[in-house]
């Protein structure tokens, strides 16, 4: 029967209702006014809920509603989880004579909605429906399209639980199983690691973490055969679903996936620790992977310093290797203030050498030592191979053994070395016998001509008693024995023409260290009565060295050849501050030239001393007679040098042939100690007493 359009104009009432209740195990749902006719234009909803873990069985025992296509007019609708499970209208009867149920629904969820709707008019009287619901057990393991458990599903009334095979564990979501494959630490220097169950399929939904931890100084090296790797391949975007990853400190290798290992077959990690992470998802498990690893000693660079030699020599040095590093000649390793020609170094766990701060650097010989009376050129540097030159203060000093030269080279042992002298420093010795100004005036000293000290730079002035001496070295004065007899500390000066006190204050005063009289000298006689002046010679050793210059320089000692034997007629020089024919006291230095004559001339001189007889005087081969009438030395000149020219020398140079000793009468012939006869004694005495006292 069709619907009248006029019926839309009469609206009796419209009811919308919704009912819900706490979860129950069963219940009844009846259409409004059941079993009477249900009202028009009404909508009513029942929210059915049974306890968790149960489904709902909904069945109708009576259904009498207006029939329409697709139940468009009146209907009862069943909805679960937003999905329509059914829509009913019309009349239904039981298909089973033994059961009153005309329609039945089993919902695997614990909630559903029942919605009753009626339109604005019914041309017949319809009584509606009667329905009942009850909680039913649901088999979650089989009743759902989505499997609730990754492995084993176990159903029970009101619920289910998941379980796992042996060696698996249940994740926190209580549904998925994984493998206990983390926490393994490998410390052996060689080993093998594989995925769980290899070569059988690895577990799904797992994260396996392994760690290789080797002793510091070794790096982990991993090797994999391509055929030993089969992991679920990457997706279309290139992302690995299952993956193998290596992480070593700040380096990462991977992730890797696919059939056949896609990475390098040998991985050098440069680290003693390696983390291995294997991660899988829920789909497509393959056979997995197998790898081998070993510890390779960390290498150290072959050269840590130039100019060195290593022992032992090897192509490669690795952790714990020890080498002796020897610097090549001329180089040394310096630490602090200490230098060494070698040191030891150990390859450390970090791939660095111990003692790497040390370097083989050129040996530094340091600032050259100064020398007395000389100087050394300032070198550009003082390192190995550098050359320096020593020189003496010319013209007053010369270099002893000059044939060896003054060149020194910085040697490998850190010393300045001369080719001939080795490490011995050159010695600057005074130039002897060379006056700054030649004495040109031929004049007798007795009442003679004034002279400059530059003409007799070897002249020594003895203050008391007034006498003379000859400087023969930096530490030695030669004089007559009778001058220093009884006087162990004579006062002496050098370098002054005048012996006024104000002049002496500005020149070098010599300090006596020791007086050594010739052992053949006969001591004790009074000079006024002495007639034996044999061996009248003495040495005075000085405490401090004499500084040579234009007014001070030594006279040479005689040589040993016959050329140094004074002969009659040889002209020699004498100087001093002795008495003249006019003055007993002389202030300015005077000098003269005297010829050598025979001892007989001296014997024939008439004796003026009333206390001595002429026949008592002793004449020996240790004496020289020199002078001529009116030209002689006198009191105050004793001990001074009688200087003869050095034979066979172009430039003027003098040696001490004699020392003023004695004479019978001033202004005539005088006796001089013959120095040549005492040459050996002089040298031996100087050698045996070569180190002056420093007191």
UniProtKB/Swiss-Prot annotation:
Heterodimer, consisting of heavy and light chains with disulfide bonds. The heavy chain is expected to be a regulatory subunit and the light chain contains the catalytic site. The modification (3R)-3-hydroxyasparagine is found at residue 155. The active site is at 482 (charge relay system), 536 (charge relay system), 638 (charge relay system). Residues 22-136, 181-296 form the CUB domain. It comes from Mesocricetus auratus. PANTHER family: COMPLEMENT C1S SUBCOMPONENT, COMPLEMENT COMPONENT 1, S SUBCOMPONENT-RELATED. SMART domains: CCP, CUB, EGF_CA, Tryp_SPc. This is Calcium-dependent serine proteinase. Residues 1-21 form the signal peptide. GO terms for cellular component: extracellular space. Residues 137-178 form the EGF-like domain. Its EC number is 3.4.21.-. The iron and 2-oxoglutarate dependent 3-hydroxylation of aspartate and asparagine is (R) stereospecific within EGF domains. One of its GO terms (biological process) is complement activation.
């Amino acid at each position: 029967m069709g619907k009248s359009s006029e019926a839309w104009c009469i609206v009796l009432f419209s009811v919308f209702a919704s009912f819900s209740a706490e979860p129950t195990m069963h219940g009844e749902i009846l259409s409004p006014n059941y079993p009477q006719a249900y009202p028009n234009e009404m909508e009513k909803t029942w929210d059915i809920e049974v306890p968790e873990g149960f489904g709902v069985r909904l069945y109708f025992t009576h259904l009498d509603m207006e029939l329409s296509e697709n139940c468009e007019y009146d209907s009862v609708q069943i909805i679960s989880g937003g999905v329509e499970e059914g829509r009913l209208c019309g009349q239904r009867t039981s298909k089973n004579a033994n059961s009153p149920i005309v329609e039945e629904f089993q919902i695997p969820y614990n909630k559903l909605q029942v919605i009753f709707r009626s339109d604005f008019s019914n041309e017949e009287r319809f009584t509606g429906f009667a329905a009942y619901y009850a909680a039913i057990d649901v088999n979650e393991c089989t009743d759902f399209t989505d499997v609730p458990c990754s492995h084993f599903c176990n159903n029970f009334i009101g619920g289910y639980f998941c379980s796992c095979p042996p060696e698996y564990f249940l994740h926190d979501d209580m549904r998925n199983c994984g493998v206990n494959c983390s926490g393994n630490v490998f410390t052996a220097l060689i080993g093998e690691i594989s995925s769980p169950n290899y070569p059988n399929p690895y577990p799904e939904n797992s994260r396996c973490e392994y760690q290789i931890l080797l002793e510091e100084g070794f790096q982990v090296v991993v090797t994999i055969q391509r055929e030993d790797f089969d992991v679920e391949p990457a997706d279309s975007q290139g992302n690995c679903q299952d993956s193998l990853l290596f992480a070593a400190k700040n380096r990462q290798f991977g992730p890797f996936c696919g059939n056949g290992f896609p990475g390098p077959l040998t991985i050098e990690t440069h680290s003693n620790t390696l983390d291995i992470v294997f991660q899988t998802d829920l789909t497509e498990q393959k056979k997995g992977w197998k790898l081998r690893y070993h510890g390779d000693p960390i290498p150290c660079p072959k050269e840590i310093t130039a100019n060195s030699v290593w022992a032992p020599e090897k192509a490669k040095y690795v952790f714990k290797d020890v080498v002796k590093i020897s610097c090549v000649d001329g180089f040394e390793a310096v630490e602090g203030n200490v230098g060494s020609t070698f040191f030891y170094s150990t390859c450390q766990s970090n791939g660095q050498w111990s003692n790497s701060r040390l370097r083989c650097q050129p040996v530094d010989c340091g600032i050259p030592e100064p020398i007395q009376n000389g100087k050394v050129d300032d070198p550009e540097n003082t390192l190995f191979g550098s050359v320096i030159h020593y020189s003496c203060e010319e013209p007053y000093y010369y270099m002893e053994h000059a044939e060896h030269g003054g060149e020194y080279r910085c040697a490998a042992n850190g010393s300045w070395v001369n080719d001939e002298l080795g490490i011995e420093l050159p010695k600057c010795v005074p130039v002897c016998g060379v006056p700054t100004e030649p004495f040109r005036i031929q004049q007798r000293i007795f009442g003679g001509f004034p002279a400059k000290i530059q003409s007799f730079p070897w002249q020594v002035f003895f203050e008391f008693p007034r006498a003379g001496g000859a400087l023969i070295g930096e530490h030695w004065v030669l004089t007559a024995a009778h001058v220093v007899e009884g006087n162990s500390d004579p006062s002496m000066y050098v370098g002054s023409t005048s012996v006024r006190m104000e002049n002496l204050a500005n020149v070098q005063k010599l300090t006596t260290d020791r007086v050594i009289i010739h052992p053949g000298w006969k001591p004790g006689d009074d000079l006024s009565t002495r007639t034996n002046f044999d061996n009248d010679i003495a040495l005075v050793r000085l405490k401090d060295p004499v500084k040579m210059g234009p007014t001070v320089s030594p006279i040479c000692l005689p040589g040993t050849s016959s050329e140094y034997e004074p002969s009659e007629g040889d002209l020699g020089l004498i100087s001093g501050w002795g008495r003249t024919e006019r003055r007993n006291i002389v202030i300015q230095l005077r000098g003269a030239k005297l010829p050598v004559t025979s001892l007989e001339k001296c014997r024939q001189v008439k004796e003026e001393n009333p206390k001595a007889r002429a026949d008592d005087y002793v004449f020996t081969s240790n004496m020289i007679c020199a002078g001529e009438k009116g030209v002689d030395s006198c009191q105050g000149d004793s001990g001074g040098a009688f200087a003869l020219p050095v034979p066979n020398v172009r430039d003027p140079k003098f040696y001490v042939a004699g020392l003023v000793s004695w004479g019978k009468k001033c202004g005539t012939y005088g006796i001089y100690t013959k120095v040549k006869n005492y040459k050996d004694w002089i040298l031996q005495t100087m050698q045996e007493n070569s180190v002056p006292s420093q007191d």
